[in-house]
Amino acid sequence: MLFSPPYQGKVFGPPLGLLSLASSIREEGFTPVIVDGATTPNFLDVISREVTDAFAFGISVLTGPMIRDAIAASRVVRQVRPELPIIYGGWHPTLLSGQTLRESFVDIIVRHQGEKTLSEILKRQSTGASLDLVAGCWFKRDGKIVTNGDRPSSPLSSLPSPAYDLVDFESYARLTGGRKLPYATSIGCPYACNYCTDMVFYNRRFNPQTVSGVVSEILHLVKTYRLDEIALVDSNFLVDTRRATALARGFLESGVRFRWTFQASTDLLCRLSDDEVALLASSGVSHIGFGTESASPEILRKMHKSHQKIDDMFEAARKCRDAGIRVTYNLIFGYPGEEDRHRRETLRVMGQIAAKFENVTFSPNLFTPYPGIPIWPELLEAGLREPQSLEGWASVGLGQAELPWLSARASEELSRSISYFMLVNQMSKGASKMRSNVSRKAMRLLEKPLHWRLKHHAFALPIELWASMAQNWLVVRRSLLTGDALGRQMKEVQ
């Protein structure tokens, strides 16, 4: 049995990682059963009932709130089947394998890419063989942790296709309002951003599927399951721009129509000609998410993100606007070493982009310190408190961490400045869509005091924010994958 705890945010589609694991273990003769907490409200009852016949229980988990439900599910399994092996995998157990394995309800850790490792673990468990020397596996023997070396990543094209036949697409369609699917054409990114877990997990290695394989499989999936949208979960889809345009050309020439979205960096998008960006749009690309993070060159250097140029942020927005592609720019505030002047510079530049390009929206986030990232030792020196148990990490969700280098006053001003920036941006876009000149002028008048607040950093008595919150109108965060609204509240102004 494979379990995916419910994730913080909107559901987009089935858990791709578990589908990949299911396909691999099925090739070894095991029958996978997937429980997705996002679509199964009573997942603890389902697990308690279905685990009675299970050979093992596996959980894939990210750092943050998912951990809470992972622990609850593990305790249910321990109670119902005390002897059943409980296997943890995914980002968090890979980054903190030892701490995770110290928990009484965790028996085995699958580190990094898990398809081959999990298959080997289950085969050995079925014959009673030892897990010694199983690459990519840590486990407990007589209460002591045994560590094996990591398994080299397998080329994606060498792994079996995820078990999409196990998906009840109707249940996801009811939740999402459409027939959507996450899909990985590649994993890994060659950049060295020091806040990114991807760099630790994949060691800066780009691991793509073949163009022909991707085109063939996606077209098959779209036609077989009547899909409306494919969200590519690649870390940085445009690493190989020739490959990206070849995929787009393959989709376009097939005659099969569907929307698709991806994430990338603005410098790579700017390597494409306007005609190539237009090709992306013609093939179905409706949205691109960019990890712009900051408009302060000084902070970008601290992030080891010098490839990110301010001019590229404007040019990427222009290219996408001209092609008719929506764009979301992710922003990170509260980074170590960031000062008020850096934040003001970011909001100033992003305000210019917002005024010039109506296709651009923003998703500002408070810096989230994930374990094991390259900058981690510096964070501890700066006073960050590291949770000492698996359960402690459940409260470290996106934008929820306490950052000791950010004072209470600075945090309050940051929250309000972000909210005012987003409110101005949202009102401006709303005004541009109004047909009535009178309505447009009225909206522009309402914007003026908000611009004044941002310019002078005057955020006392934020009555405009309270009003917008009361109407549940202000969008604060968006999905980098699709641009869809994720959050409508900032904690400070509730």
Where do the model's predicted regions map?
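Flexible glycine/acidic-rich beta-alpha junction loops that bind and position SAM and/or redox cofactors
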Residues: 9, 96-97, 191, 241-242, ...
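Radical SAM [4Fe-4S] cluster-binding motif and immediate context
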Residues: 157, 162-328, 333-335, 348
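Glycine-rich beta-alpha loop elements in corrinoid/cobalamin-binding modules
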Residues: 17, 21-152, 372
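Radical SAM enzyme core and accessory elements
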Residues: 2, 55, 374-377, 387-494
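Nucleotide-activated donor-dependent transferases that construct or modify glycoconjugates
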Residues: 1-9
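Catalytic cores of alpha/beta
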Residues: 97-103, 337-352
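Glycine- and acidic-residue-enriched helix-capping/strand-helix junction motifs
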Residues: 8-18
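Residue-level recognition of beta-strand->loop/alpha-helix junctions
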Residues: 4, 34-38, 200, 291, ...
